[in-house]
Amino acid sequence: MIIFLGAFILLLCISTPITVALGGCSLVYALVGGTVPITTLIQTTFGGLTSFPLLAIPLFMLAGNLMNEGGLTPDLVNFARHLLGHIRGGLGHATILACAIFAAISGAAVATAVAIGVVMLPAMKKAGYDEGVAAALTSTAACLGPIIPHSIPFIIYGVSANVSIAALFVGGVFPGIVLAAALMVYMYFVAARHDYPRDPKKSWKETLLTAGKALPALFMPVLIMGGILSGMFTPTEAAGVTVVYSAVMGAFYYRQLNFKNLPKVFLKSGLESGMVMLLIAMSEPFAWFVAADQIPQLIIDWISQVTTSPYAILLLINAFLLLLGIPMETAPALVIVTPILVPIGAAVGIDPVHLGIVVCLNLVLGLITPPVGAVLFAVCGMSGMTLDRLSKAIWPPFFVALVVLAVVTYLPWLSTYLPRLVLGR
């Protein structure tokens, strides 16, 4: 165990890519330990990619890129603005709503921040919003991407923990709504304090017209969740249906998707999904060695000497994951901690669906935690703000998200009620 963990920490300290660190420490352990044949290392590496649910990752990524390239974002933002723009802080509310809807299409925080931010950041700045407030709100609202179904982190966690992906998708609905609502309340008071302008109230006829134009984007979450909950298709099959739907809408409804931009979409989707799949492949022998060395059991024994309270353990998990999420991206952090945390949660009676949503929400907040949050870098690139300025502006909405994290952590029914109601688990 010392050789295994020592090799992993050493590789991380010398800035080795996380995939190389995961595979490298497993290889060192197999070679030096001498108790595990190399064939086991190879079998677990390739075996990790044979899981049928993993096929949903590249398909959902492709669907999101097809819809984004197909030109849905302007119509989606226009609908959100018509619906909420007349409320105090309306542009901020429209940004949150647009992020929530796009989250159900992309399943990723950075993609949500880029797609919505490129439209809404200039609009808020033009309307007189403080640039820091606008950028910080967009960054935090982008965290809805991996929480509202569908969600790439939920798929990774579900496969790693052997938990129903459909249950995770359904369980993420209420936490996503709570986070969106909390950010809207925050934006309302910020707008009242700074007297931000409102858009003129639109008639219902105008709003319905914009809703009609955005209908393909609005219907996609219904298609995904409706098909899964009705038993029409599995989450993986839903991803395939979504790809076909996105391609048809982009080509024939929005008419911006053609053979010229398809290679760019395929290349981008291939690179994004390839990185995730390689990470998962390298994590499989890592998880196997973690289980073989009984590392989760050692941690459970140590924690049980301190406390056996699920609430205290959830607090420790939150603190650990918030710190881990600062230097590490969501996907690699998930494949490392899931094999360790799931047995710990099971030992104290924490529902695995609830634990999965808490883990994912924690790690997603790492994407907006200074100084190395990936979403912060993306928003800085779009807005032209310095990272230092955005790092200062991010704290108020970040603390709102922390409050939501506490609520989701200690009110488990927010994550488990819907799965039990509609899936019977």
Predicted regions and their residues:
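Alpha-helical transmembrane segments of multi-pass membrane transport proteins
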Residues: 1-425
